[in-house]
Amino acid sequence: MKTFVFHIFIFALVAFASASRDSAKKIGSQYEHYATCLTENDAAADDIFTILDITSGHHKNENEHDKQHKNGCVMHCLLEKDGLMTGADYHEEKIREDYIKETGAQPGDKRLEALDTCMNETKDMTDKCDKSLLLVACVLIAEDSLATSTEASTEA
């Protein structure tokens, strides 16, 4: 029993350390075209929100409008270069396929439901930059919320 509890503790510690490390990452920085998209949008890495900025809601600060738009344009560039968007239009099936590959989500996974909800909530937006940032933010916030609720249910 002690060994089982110890393994659970180690698993939780590794998950926490991984989440903390990931939260400091700049959104989109793990993708191949990140540097190109920064250059194409006259952005520096310091201009880009971290995952924590998004999940904590800091990106919604009214004083951050220019930064929000710049972040959105970088996200749009990444999505377009990966074939997930053309202009302001999503390629929904391709987005789902790539998301499944990246996350390992299976049918019925709440993350897929969240992705669909996020696409539906933003699909009618016409500004491609704002639309891209809101999609990415929506997905990151949903993933964070789902992870938090999963952690809470395993602790109970």
Curated annotation (Swiss-Prot):
Function as written in the Swiss-Prot or TrEMBL entry: Colony queen number, a major feature of social organization, is associated with worker genotype for Gp-9. Colonies are headed by either a single reproductive queen (monogyne form) or multiple queens (polygyne form). Differences in worker Gp-9 genotypes between social forms may cause differences in workers' abilities to recognize queens and regulate their numbers.
Write out the annotated subcellular location: Secreted
This protein's GO cellular component annotations are: extracellular space
Q: Name one Pfam family in it.
A: PBP_GOBP
Keyword match Disulfide bond: yes
Name the Gene3D superfamilies on file: Pheromone/general odorant binding protein domain
Q: List the disulfide bonds.
A: 37-77, 73-129, 118-138
Gene transcribed to yield this protein:
Gp-9
Q: Name one GO biological process term.
A: social behavior
| Endpoints of the signal sequence | 1-19
Protein name as catalogued:
Pheromone-binding protein Gp-9
Q: Hey, which family's this protein in?
A: Belongs to the PBP/GOBP family.
- Presence of the UniProt keyword Disulfide bond in the record: yes
Task: Fetch the SUPFAM superfamilies from UniProt.
Answer: Insect pheromone/odorant-binding proteins
Which keywords appear in this protein's UniProt record, sorted alphabetically? Behavior, Disulfide bond, Pheromone response, Pheromone-binding, Secreted, Signal, Transport
State the species of origin.
Solenopsis globularia littoralis (Fire ant)
Molecular functions per Gene Ontology: pheromone binding
Subunit notes for this chain?
Homodimer.
Concerning InterPro entries, the annotation shows: PBP/GOBP, PBP_GOBP_sf, Pheromone-bd_protein_Gp-9
**Principal location:** secreted
Q: Which domain of life is it from?
A: Eukaryota
